Amino acid sequence: MGKPMSKNLLKAGYELVVFDFNKDAVKEVTECGAVSAASGREVAEQCGVVITMVPNSPHVRAAVLGENGVADGAKPGTVLIDMSSIDPTESKDIGAELAKKGIDMLDAPVSGGEPKAIDGTLSVMVGGKKELFDKYYDMLMVMAGSVVYVGELVPATWQSWQTRLWLL
């Protein structure tokens, strides 16, 4: 879902530096105006805000804390917005590791699937510092029909899980 979300950000005028192991996805997004990077580290070296959207908890951990990951290139004050739907304890642990390096994290799992990612009508539940939510609200709304602040870092992931269980 990261590809259509990226395209919506580009259409809204945001400049993007992108990395993905899926080279076809990177090619498609760079053809729309993004710049490609060789790693998450390289993205973080060039950006003050990094958005991750990957399939699961191990992928987020690798992309953020792994070798050549976001944390390797991020400077203090960088903000990570993880839009993946991952295990809440993993989100909390990643946020704690980033905080040690002066990196803030917003947990912003999405609901709605690829069709809603394409048309920019995802639902996003955001956890983290309220001032960061306020600062990045407009950017998140480019990808969503609904962006809701749910409190500190972990409650967003819990809320996402509860919503999924409710829908079952």
Region spans (language model):
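Rossmann-fold dinucleotide-binding core
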Residues: S85-L165
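Rossmann-fold NAD(P) dinucleotide-binding segment
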Residues: G40-M105
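NAD(P)+-binding Rossmann beta1-loop-alpha1 motif at the extreme N-terminus of oxidoreductases
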Residues: M1-T52, T78, M83
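Hydrophobic alpha-helical segments typical of transmembrane helices
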Residues: M5, A25, S39, H59, ...
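Residue-level "edge-of-site" marker
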Residues: N22, E42, S57, S111, ...
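Short secondary-structure transition/capping segments
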Residues: V29-E31, G48-I51, V64, I118-T121, ...
